[in-house]
């Protein structure tokens, strides 16, 4: 039986974007006006920090890099973070939860993210990382660097969510713009932060406090996160389907998830049977002994829409996932069988995952200069101004 819990408004959530890509991800979230969260951009590149529209920026490693960046060298990124560890500790110390956003494969993000995560964990902060892995065409060296960075990062975070950039090619519709494709990846981080922030800061019929969030996400290893929005008579089923599919994430098997955190956001018109539908979706993949925390957030701006955010944790270590997946795409077979055939009106871009953006590049005659833009080691490539 679910019991209402007193709302806790005191939890401090910080989102730390590391490197050029992580900074871009944080800037995107600032522009999306996520409430109840503090945002920081950390970089070795002074020029990148001057251009970014994030209020709180921190330059690291100025003595090592002279403000010129890490030159795609993770060792430089690591040393830069260690050089400014006291400063980093000061911005983290009062947080209850920290999200780390970074692209893996470059210099600053790959090298500094594990150091910052380590500092956060030593301070007793619930630490969650959302990172990307590079496109295959960015080269074997960058991919190896990314794998090493993720493996090191996984030692110091409570939960880890990975977005392989190649999924943007395999999943999204043919002809989608580059900006929209990268913004779709950015929405994974936004969904996780927004869903958890709303759970503990917005009133609802079933309130959740930060202790519940910590129970589900602490020391859980690999995680899956998804958000779905739908409207109409089947909105609960459709939103759950979208949330649980998470086609942009590293391929994982949800069966046996040890922790599940769910936020349902709607207006005042949510029905009991809709709540049951979402609950049955959770039961379809979680372990019988899983810790399940469900909260609702009221938002009158949702009108007829309903949003479901699901964070499933305790799915295994990063090395377990890497060993099981290799390069094969298993996404569809990991959706619970009772949801596999459901078609949704809200997610037409997922209907044909075999369409390739790369085909569009070839058809449109993308130049070498434009392809070099894709090779920028960033979480999201900054749009040209």
Swiss-Prot record:
Q: Where does GTP bind?
A: 20-24, 107-109, 138, 142, 186
Keyword Cell membrane applies: no
Instruction: Indicate where this protein resides in the cell.
Output: Cytoplasm
Keywords annotated in UniProt: Cell cycle, Cell division, Cytoplasm, GTP-binding, Nucleotide-binding, Septation
Its GO biological process annotations read:
division septum assembly; FtsZ-dependent cytokinesis; protein polymerization
Oligomeric state and interaction partners are given as: Homodimer. Polymerizes to form a dynamic ring structure in a strictly GTP-dependent manner. Interacts directly with several other division proteins.
* GO cellular component terms listed in the entry, alphabetical order: cell division site; cytoplasm
Q: What does this chain do?
A: Essential cell division protein that forms a contractile ring structure (Z ring) at the future cell division site. The regulation of the ring assembly controls the timing and the location of cell division. One of the functions of the FtsZ ring is to recruit other cell division proteins to the septum to produce a new cell wall between the dividing cells. Binds GTP and shows GTPase activity.
Tell me which PANTHER family the record gives: CELL DIVISION PROTEIN FTSZ-RELATED, MITOCHONDRIAL DIVISION PROTEIN FSZA
According to the UniProt entry, its GO molecular function terms are: GTP binding; GTPase activity
- Under which name does UniProt file this protein? Cell division protein FtsZ
Principal localization reads cytoplasm
Regarding protein family, the annotation reads: Belongs to the FtsZ family.
């Amino acid at each position: 039986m679910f019991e209402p819990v007193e709302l806790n408004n005191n939890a401090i959530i910080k989102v730390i974007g590391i490197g050029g890509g992580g900074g871009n991800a944080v800037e995107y979230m600032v522009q999306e006006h996520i409430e109840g969260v503090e945002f920081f951009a950390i970089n070795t590149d002074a020029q990148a920090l001057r251009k970014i529209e994030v209020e709180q920026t921190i330059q690291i490693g100025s003595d090592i890099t002279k403000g010129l960046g890490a030159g795609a060298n993770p060792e430089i990124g690591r040393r830069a973070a260690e050089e400014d560890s006291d400063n980093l500790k000061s911005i983290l110390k009062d947080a209850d939860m920290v999200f780390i956003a970074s692209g893996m494969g470059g210099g600053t993000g790959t090298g500094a993210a594990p150091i910052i995560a380590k500092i956060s964990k030593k301070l007793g902060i619930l630490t969650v990382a959302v990172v990307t892995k590079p496109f295959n065409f960015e080269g074997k060296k960058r991919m190896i660097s990314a794998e090493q960075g993720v493996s090191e990062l996984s030692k110091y975070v409570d939960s880890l969510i990975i977005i392989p950039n190649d999924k943007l090619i395999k999943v999204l519709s043919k002809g989608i713009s580059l900006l929209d494709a990268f913004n779709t990846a950015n929405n994974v981080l936004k969904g996780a932060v927004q869903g958890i922030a709303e759970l503990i800061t917005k009133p609802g019929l079933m309130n959740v406090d930060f202790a519940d969030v910590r129970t589900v996400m602490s020391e859980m290893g690999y995680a899956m996160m998804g958000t779905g929005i739908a409207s109409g008579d089947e909105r609960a089923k459709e939103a759950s389907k979208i949330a649980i599919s998470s086609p942009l994430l590293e391929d994982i098997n949800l069966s046996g998830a040890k922790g599940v955190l769910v936020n349902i956001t709607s207006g005042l018109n949510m029905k009991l049977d809709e709540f049951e539908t979402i609950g049955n979706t959770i039961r379809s993949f979680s372990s019988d002994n899983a810790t399940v925390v469900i909260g609702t957030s009221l938002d009158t701006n949702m009108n007829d829409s309903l949003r479901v955010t699901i964070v499933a944790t305790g799915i295994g270590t990063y090395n377990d996932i890497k060993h099981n997946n290799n390069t094969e795409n298993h996404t569809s077979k990991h959706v619970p069988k009772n949801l596999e055939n459901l078609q949704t009106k809200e997610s037409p871009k997922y209907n044909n995952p075999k369409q390739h953006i790369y085909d569009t590049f070839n058809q449109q005659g993308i130049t070498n200069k434009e392809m070099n833009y894709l090779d920028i080691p960033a979480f999201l490539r900054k749009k040209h101004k």
